[in-house]
Amino acid sequence: MANTKSAKKRIRSDARKRLRNQSYRSRVKTMIKKAELALANGIVDEAALRAAYSTLDKAAVKGIIHKNNAARRKSRLAQKAKKVALAAQAGSAA
C-alpha cells in the first residue's frame, strides 16, 4: 500500500484516469460496432464510418490506444466498406 502522500495522490489520480480511459475505450468500441453493423447489413454508412474514424483518431491522440492500433482498425473498417461497396456495385450492375 502507498506510504507517502504523493503515492496516495497518485493512486487517486490513476483511478480517475482509468475511469476516463475506460469510458473512451468503450465509446471507440461502440462506434466501431455501429459501423460494422451497417456494413454487415450491406450498407456503407458514411456518417458511421466518419464517426468511427474520428473517435479512433481522438483516442490515439489522447494516448488511450496506440496510433498504430487506431490506424489498423481504421484500415480494416475501410477494407470492409470497400468490399461492401464493390459488392453493391456488382449487384446493381448485374
Curated annotation (Swiss-Prot):
Keyword RNA-binding among record annotations: yes
A Pfam family of this chain: Ribosomal_S20p
Gene Ontology biological process terms, A to Z: translation
Top-level taxon: Bacteria
RNA-binding is among the record's keywords: yes
UniProt-annotated stretches for the region Disordered: 1-20
GO molecular function: small ribosomal subunit rRNA binding; structural constituent of ribosome
GO cellular component: cytosol; small ribosomal subunit
Entries under Gene3D superfamilies matching the protein: Ribosomal protein S20
Keyword entries, A-Z: Ribonucleoprotein, Ribosomal protein, RNA-binding, rRNA-binding
Protein family: Belongs to the bacterial ribosomal protein bS20 family.
Reported function: Binds directly to 16S ribosomal RNA.
Listed NCBIfam families: S20 (TIGR00029)
Protein's UniProt name: Small ribosomal subunit protein bS20
Organism: Chloroflexus aggregans (strain MD-66 / DSM 9485)
Biological classification of the source: Bacteria, Bacillati, Chloroflexota, Chloroflexia, Chloroflexales
Gene: rpsT
